């Protein structure tokens, strides 16, 4: 396993659309190593999720997982470890629940983004088994954020207002910009 370099905003790879993962790909040693590396990279950076494009791989692959309080997102609930291939998301509520999002590709900053609190997600797992699930709350927000990366979208593209964007140290624990 290896910690991979996380690409930062400005790198053109982050703005490209990823390709689907094929069933034959998931059987390869390289793909299995990629998944292990992604989990290790995510944990090393204290992230909740990581999309393959963030490490320069243009494949529709996301890993998520947060077992206990994450230092970057105190007070947030657990997110189960999950490998997600070729996701499709359908919003089931209007984009009204706001959250101060951060991103490993936009280090040291946060922005207020409103997203649907309830989604339907179809995806395949690491065994290429298809899943279809209704997801709500924090996990739904995390999954939408990570899946955006697969289509070249960063959370800064979804800011409610550029006035609600700043450095971590300028945002208090309640998510308000400090004066």
Swiss-Prot record:
Active site: 146
Protein name: Peptide deformylase
Binding site for Fe cation: 103, 145, 149
NCBIfam families on file: pept_deformyl, PRK00150.1-3
Record field: catalytic activity: N-terminal N-formyl-L-methionyl-[peptide] + H2O = N-terminal L-methionyl-[peptide] + formate
Protein family membership: Belongs to the polypeptide deformylase family.
Keywords annotated in UniProt: Hydrolase, Iron, Metal-binding, Protein biosynthesis
Cofactor, how bound (note): Binds 1 Fe(2+) ion.
Requisite cofactors: Fe(2+)
Main function: Removes the formyl group from the N-terminal Met of newly synthesized proteins. Requires at least a dipeptide for an efficient rate of reaction. N-terminal L-methionine is a prerequisite for activity but the enzyme has broad specificity at other positions.
InterPro entries per the UniProt record, alphabetical: Peptide_deformylase, Peptide_deformylase_sf
Record-listed E.C. numbers: 3.5.1.88
GO biological process, one term: translation
The UniProt record lists the keyword Iron: yes
GO molecular-function term, one example from the UniProt record: metal ion binding
Presence of keyword Methyltransferase: no
């Amino acid at each position: 396993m290896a910690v991979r370099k996380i690409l930062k905003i400005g790198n053109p790879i982050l703005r490209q659309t990823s390709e689907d993962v094929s069933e034959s790909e998931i059987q390869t040693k390289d793909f299995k190593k990629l998944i292990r590396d992604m989990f290790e990279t995510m944990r090393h950076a204290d992230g909740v999720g990581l999309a393959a494009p963030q490490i320069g791989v243009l494949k529709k692959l996301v890993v998520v997982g947060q077992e206990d309080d994450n230092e970057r997102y105190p007070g947030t609930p657990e997110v189960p470890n999950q490998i997600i291939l070729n996701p499709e998301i359908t919003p089931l509520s209007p984009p009204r629940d706001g959250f101060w999002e951060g991103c490993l590709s936009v280090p040291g900053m946060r922005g207020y983004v409103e997203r649907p609190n309830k989604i339907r997600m179809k995806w395949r797992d690491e065994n290429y088994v298809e899943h279809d699930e209704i997801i709500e709350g924090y996990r739904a927000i995390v999954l939408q954020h990570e899946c955006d990366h697969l289509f070249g979208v960063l959370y800064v593209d979804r800011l409610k207002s550029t006035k609600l964007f700043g450095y971590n140290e300028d945002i208090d624990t309640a998510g308000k910009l400090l004066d």
